[in-house]
């Protein structure tokens, strides 16, 4: 989703956090550095690999963050495809200062990101896809979100490893995909991330999904990446893309 990007970290229950700390940043600065090994994350290289975002893909971030803002006397107005520029004081004509929005963003992820609702059909689709593919959750979120984001995944029946990335997702996605000869797919709501993955890993099938109904009319699209906002249809498309 929108907002600042933290250092890359992984929470899989199978690998030391120190091993993957700052991997995303290092990959961006030093392209020769490899991503965490799939085996160390508990993933097989003998099955297709599906990389999936969380905010506005698996989870309704804008809805949850909006509820959080109400508790702070603010409101979220969805009138553009943006984050901080949609935060207002009630009755105000100008959005909240971005610096203040960032503080609230960090506070939300530090203490409330596990409260977001799942995107309709997303959990069921991942459970279905996991029968024939390896699933890895690749999310740009502050480092403070590690524990609660993993808790959110587990409470919804998703045991898959989580990597918190920094910046564009192409470098780390390419490093992960390069470890398997099987087909791969990537799902995100943001075109910069989708373009980054397609640029770094052209063979990876990329799909755009925007979960929040209010955001969909404002979300830019690209012919490079099929836009599929229904998770059942998206799961069909992913299965077709990774089928041997």
Language-model segments: which ranges?
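Substrate-recognition "cap/lid" segment bordering the active-site pocket of phosphatases
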Residues: 142-185, 192-198
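Short acidic-hydrophobic, aromatic-tinged amphipathic segments that line or gate anion-handling sites
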Residues: 161-167, 224-233
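Metal-dependent phosphoesterase signature
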Residues: 88-121
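Glycine-rich phosphate-binding loop signature in dinucleotide/nucleotide-binding domains
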Residues: 44-45, 131-132, 177-183
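Short, charged, surface-exposed secondary-structure boundary motifs
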Residues: 171-175, 215-223, 237-239
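Substrate-recognition element of Asp-dependent hydrolases with the DxDx(T/V) motif
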Residues: 113, 117-118, 122-152, 163-165
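Active-site neighborhood of HAD-like aspartate-dependent phosphohydrolases
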Residues: 15-100
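Acidic, Mg2+-coordinating phosphoryl-transfer loop and its flanking beta/alpha structural elements
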Residues: 186-229
